[in-house]
Amino acid sequence: MIKSKSIWSPNKSRGEYKNYILVIGESARRDYVHSFGGKYSNTPWLDSAPAMIFDNYISAGPSTMISLTNTLSLRKGSVLELNNNVVTLASKAGFETWWLSNQGSKGHFDSPISLIGHSADYSEFIKSGSSDDRLISPDENLLPLLDVALNKNKNENKLIVLHLMGSHPKACIRTNNTYDIDVGAKEVSCYIKSIEMTDQFLSKVISLANQTGESWSVMYFSDHGLSYVNKDTQGAYLTHGDKTKENYEVPFFIINSNSEIKEVVHQPRSALDFMTTFSQWLKISDRNIPSACNMLSNENCSNEDYVIDFNGNYIKFNDLPSV
């Protein structure tokens, strides 16, 4: 449990929508997502959805722990303040908060993220052990929990966070060894399928949100990308790395209950500035959060080119090769 209280003192906000649903994906490379230019047709729902697509969004780090702690928490210099996170910010602003996770709560690398999750008013972790166990745990198991969250305390404005297993290696565990598109390497074929499964999951999230009859906004991003091992061979697979752009290039989009057309934000956006993006999404202002640039637009914002490597160093994303 996080013992230090948050320092947030935001304006009270009811946001523009009744229910805000933040879906945190796992290990999805942007170039494997059809809606973001991937060549494999694996996102039929998102392809036709009137979403705001961010096609130059980069993750904060190359792994779940590095990425999400630096995405979801306030940073002062090189110091992370886990108590000052998106959940506690939303709570202080008047939202009822939920954290529903299909990732672990007890593994070494899970712990900082689960601490953030446990700061919600309601939290539930489907996997009681570590996220790195090799057991099948479909993300669809989160849907009944989401249904409960949406329909409990209907008078409350809510932030509901869904943390997926998504495309976490090994991908064939995620898909139960099934795939539709055979690219000659089984793990890569499963990886393509795992992204299609996330697309199907997201369509069901939207369906549940619609069933409430209330307004909603859904934001999705993947925590990080992956890199190739044995590329272009039958034994090719994708795993964590920090040496290429593809380790950080991830899908990010927002869709609302009143969205009518697809929009594209081409300007670079970094997850290191996610606290600003998040606060603007929920219509929250706080003196501790920079707000000079409109992240939810095509405004040219500065310093959107940095990421963190495995050693905790800040590096320039554009200096990395693309492989």
Where do the protein language model's features map onto the residues?
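DG-centered beta-turn motif at the end of beta-strands
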Residues: I24-A28, Y220-G225
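Active-site-proximal alpha/beta segments of enzymes that process anionic O-linked groups
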Residues: M1-V23, S27-T178, E249, A271, ...
